[in-house]
Amino acid sequence: MSELKIEQIPTRTDNSVYLIKESGQGKVGVVDPSDAEPVIETLNRLGWELTHIINTHHHNDHTGGNIELKEKYGCIVVGPLADHDRIAGIDIDLKDGDTYKFGDALAHVYDTPGHTRGHIAYWFDESKALFCGDTLFALGCGRVFEGTFEQMWDSLGKLRA
C-alpha cells in the first residue's frame, strides 16, 4: 500500500481543495476541485502531473474545475454513482462499500447522504485521511439540501465509526 502526501488549497471564500499524491506509483489526485486555476498553479509549483479528479458530490463548488482539469491533463474523474448524471466528465462511479485503488493507495467509499442524496466519503486507512466533502466541517456539518436530518445524523455516525 501507499501513503498520501496532502496539499490543501484554499479556494473561493470558504472552500478547500485537496491535492493528494500517493507514494507508490506517484498518482496525483484533486479532491473536489471548485476551480481549475488554483489547482493548476499548485500543480505547477509542486511539479506534479494530475491523474485523477475525486468528487464527493455534485455541487459546483466541488466540481466546477472538473472539465477544464480533465481536458488539460486527460485525467480520470471518479465520483458517486447516485450523482453520475450531475457530475461533468465522470468516468468511474462509486457507491457505499466500494474500494477505489488510487495508484497503490486504497480508499474505502462510504455513502454519506444528508447534504446531498448522492454524497460519498473516501477513507484512506493507511494515511488516516478522510475526504468527506460537505458532510463534516471543523465546526459542524454541512447544510441539508437534498437529504434529511436523519440521513445526515446517520452519515455523521458512520464517519465517527
Q: What are the residue ranges of the model-derived segments?
A:
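Short, histidine-centered active-site or binding-site loop motifs used for metal coordination
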Residues: 21-24, 81, 135-137
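Metallo-beta-lactamase
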Residues: 106, 116-161
